[in-house]
Amino acid sequence: MATQALVSSSSLTFAAEAVRQSFRARSLPSSVGCSRKGLVRAAATPPVKQGGVDRPLWFASKQSLSYLDGSLPGDYGFDPLGLSDPEGTGGFIEPRWLAYGEVINGRFAMLGAVGAIAPEYLGKVGLIPQETALAWFQTGVIPPAGTYNYWADNYTLFVLEMALMGFAEHRRFQDWAKPGSMGKQYFLGLEKGFGGSGNPAYPGGPFFNPLGFGKDEKSLKELKLKEVKNGRLAMLAILGYFIQGLVTGVGPYQNLLDHVADPVNNNVLTSLKFH
């Protein structure tokens, strides 16, 4: 976690001095054989060694590099608001919870990004009936935007959904607060599969990693990085779905088809009336 950067005062002093020299555009010692510019740039920045981890830096600052040591998947020192700073005014939420929440929300976003566009796409290719091939905002999740005819009324479905999700989220929080505790509580004889790995974000086991991915540390590290990157992209995609729905009134797949058919008249600028 981010607080690992504070374990060794000597390594922190060295890291802070390296960052200070880079901001002053000073050359590193000749033994290193390279020099750095005064600004820490975005993804184009060459990998640097900070806290023992080689990584590119994205608009990192001296302060953010004091607690973001590269130990987290997808950590490039980017924290302009100081949300992960354990001692700063921005750190009003525990950094460990923020890192955990990003992974969980990224997984939900990846499922949502696919689930929101799937019915629309399947309807276009004729795999499901047109009456169910609806844009995501017309399925009843936003009542004014669409109607539906399910087995129960919307209030019953809402209460049922909240009860089921609330139970699952409560169990997940229990495991975060006390890792491994779910494997000690009886749960229909399945509790052994919920024992976890000691890391609540990556519980593993037959239910959460049935294919046994990440059997060694190197492959597990690569998979964690890929998951975080795709999760961040999916969260942006969900935001894009919302904006598209509000602006154009059609689903994301139809927006894509319209853009491909006529990119000059169907794009971000024309949709937002910047023309």
Swiss-Prot record:
Annotated transmembrane regions: 233-253
Role of this protein: The light-harvesting complex (LHC) functions as a light receptor, it captures and delivers excitation energy to photosystems with which it is closely associated. May channel protons produced in the catalytic Mn center of water oxidation into the thylakoid lumen.
Encoding gene (name): lhca3
Binding site for chlorophyll b 3: E169
Protein name per the record: Chlorophyll a-b binding protein 3, chloroplastic
GO biological process per UniProt: photosynthesis, light harvesting
Annotated positions binding chlorophyll a 1: F78, S84, E102, R232
Disulfide cysteine pairs (residue numbers): none
Organism of provenance: Pisum sativum
Subcellular location: Plastid, Chloroplast thylakoid membrane
PTM text: Photoregulated by reversible phosphorylation of its threonine residues.
Residues reported in the UniProt entry to bind chlorophyll b 2: R107, I142
Keyword Thylakoid belongs to the record: yes
SUPFAM superfamilies assigned: Chlorophyll a-b binding protein
Superkingdom of the source species: Eukaryota
Binding site for chlorophyll a 5: K226, Q244
Gene Ontology MF terms in the entry: chlorophyll binding; metal ion binding
Keyword check for Heme: no
Record's comment describing the protein's domains: The N-terminus of the protein extends into the stroma where it is involved with adhesion of granal membranes and post-translational modifications; both are believed to mediate the distribution of excitation energy between photosystems I and II.
Details of cofactor binding: Binds at least 14 chlorophylls (8 Chl-a and 6 Chl-b) and carotenoids such as lutein and neoxanthin.
Binding-site positions, chlorophyll a 3: E227
Binding site for chlorophyll b 1: W58
Binding-site residues for chlorophyll a 4, renumbered to this chain: N230
Subunit relationships: The LHC complex consists of chlorophyll a-b binding proteins.
Binding-site residues, chlorophyll a 6: H259
